[in-house]
Amino acid sequence: MIKIIFSILSLYVFSTLTLADEDLENEAVKLLQAYLKVDTISPPGNESRAVDFLAKIFDEEGIEYDSAESAPTRGNIWARIKGGDKPALILLHHSDVVPANEEYWDFDPLSGEIVDGYIQGRGALDMKGLGISHLANFLKLHRSNKSLNRDLIYIAVSYTHLTLPTKRIV
């Protein structure tokens, strides 16, 4: 079985929506591998590539979203599942990654390769892995058509490894 490192917080928050569902787990593995291949190394960032990747998924799922750039090519995206009147729960991750010194890697750091049962690649732990964990649960809730007591907002922000102009967007 492929071992995926997901945020303990994410699994705690969604304890009733775990990734025990094999189809969802397989989908999450493929999504993470694909997301790791999206080059968002900062500098220069190019997080708009991550926005395009996530927007395609939202389009396929029929999920409305918005996006904006905090600077040229520094894209941010957010989507919402409407719920009740309680304060919204925000699922936030950043889509930029730091440069990889390839001499310390046995494979392409943007490959999303599975090594010894683990998905490897720049951003797997910080923070694209968390982003896909959030996304898998966000998609599961969207597909379930369950009534929520609060809005659930998925956000991918840019530009965290240099400065934080993203605060204008959020």
Residue ranges of predicted features:
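Conserved small/polar residues in nucleotide/adenosyl-binding loops
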Residues: 160-166
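Sec-dependent signal peptide recognition
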Residues: 1-8
